[in-house]
Design a protein with these regions (language model features):
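Catalytic-core segments of hydrolase enzymes
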Residues: 1-64, 103-108
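C-terminal subdomain of the subtilisin-like protease fold in secreted/lumenal serine endopeptidases
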Residues: 3-4, 20, 27-30, 42, ...
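Short glycine/serine/threonine-biased micro-segments
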Residues: 10, 55, 72, 82, ...
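Short, electropositive, low-hydrophobicity segments enriched in small/polar residues
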Residues: 13-16, 36, 78, 88, ...
Length: 132
């Protein structure tokens, strides 16, 4: 956007085709969740628009209190994959401009669920988009 920021938000975990905010705002990349089978997670909100794409959101290992680790589920685990990919796209030498990040993210893996926007995040293809 005009402030040089890529805004990414989780789509929500109501298992419904509803718009939640801030993901429903213009210019925000709204992220749904997929399973390890590349299918729509049962809990994820869905529908395009506003869902722009999906990323893994089930069984994501994360840090946990007292120096341990645990697996987490939810679109709040999906959105950081997209944020990290956007950072890689912007950080590449000669990388993408902020305005072209969404186009690169749209180079997602074409899983066959139109409710998940452009499909599942493909970090490699998104970063390669910046070098075309």
């Amino acid at each position: 956007n005009s402030n040089g920021v890529v805004s990414v938000a989780s789509a929500g975990n109501d298992g419904q085709q509803i718009m939640v905010y801030p993901g429903g705002l213009p210019g925000v990349v709204d992220v749904a969740s997929t399973s390890n089978q590349d299918t729509q997670s049962v809990f994820t909100n869905y529908g395009a628009p506003p869902v722009y794409l999906a990323a893994p959101g089930e069984g994501v290992v994360t840090t946990y209190p007292w120096g341990t680790y645990a697996a987490g589920w939810g679109t709040s685990f999906s959105a950081p994959f997209v944020s990290g990919t956007a950072a890689l796209m912007l950080g590449q030498n000669g990388g993408c401009s902020v305005s072209s990040v969404a186009s690169g993210l749209a180079k997602a893996d074409g899983i066959s669920d139109p409710q998940l926007g452009h499909g599942r995040l493909d970090t490699y293809s998104a970063v390669q988009f910046c070098h075309q």
